[in-house]
């Protein structure tokens, strides 16, 4: 068995999966998967608690190490990928303020319209930023937080995407 192994983690909307593979030959040593829950309602809300991702990552990493019969010191790197455009709001201490609004959350559609109207038109938005303002993206989620949960908005210091939050958990760095 290789002296150096990598762990790959993918935290998706429905679950977290992971692999341990050899640096030398790329051979997969072990695989693991854990489901995620989803908070949803008829109004388009789609949220998850970031601690669910951390619990899932811990579980998956534990399964990977157990199933591959390798020691932690053989792991030379962990790579993280995951769902995009979820808004993980953190306060100044790095604590999660509320559940993360996910990429598939459409509850923020009115805020998308407000941002577009403020800029002038859908065409002007595309001219300025190259995209329309979509409910799945982060800007409307921040405005939603300001308008619907002002007490939480006042605490907001950092916004991370889901995979960035997992990297923050692993490294302690908010990047």
Q: What is each of the regions a protein language model found here?
A:
Residues 1-98, 127, 155:
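N-terminal glycine/serine-rich phosphate-binding loop of ATP-dependent small-molecule kinases
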């Amino acid at each position: 068995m290789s002296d150096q192994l990598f762990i790959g983690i993918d935290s998706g909307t429905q679950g977290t999966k992971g692999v341990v593979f050899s640096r030398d030959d790329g051979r997969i040593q072990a695989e693991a998967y854990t489901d995620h829950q989803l908070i949803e309602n008829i109004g388009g809300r789609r949220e998850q608690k970031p601690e669910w991702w951390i619990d899932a990552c811990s579980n998956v990493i534990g399964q990977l190490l157990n199933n591959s019969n390798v020691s932690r010191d053989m792991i030379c790197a962990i790579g993280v990928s995951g769902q995009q455009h979820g808004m993980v709001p953190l306060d100044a201490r790095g604590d999660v303020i509320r559940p993360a609004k996910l990429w598939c959350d459409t509850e923020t559609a009115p805020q998308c319209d407000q941002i577009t109207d403020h800029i002038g038109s859908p065409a002007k938005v595309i001219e300025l930023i190259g995209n329309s303002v979509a409910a799945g993206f982060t800007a409307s989620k921040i405005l939603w937080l300001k308008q619907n949960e002002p007490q939480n908005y006042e605490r907001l210091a950092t916004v991370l995407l889901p995979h960035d939050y997992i990297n923050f958990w692993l490294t302690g760095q908010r990047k």
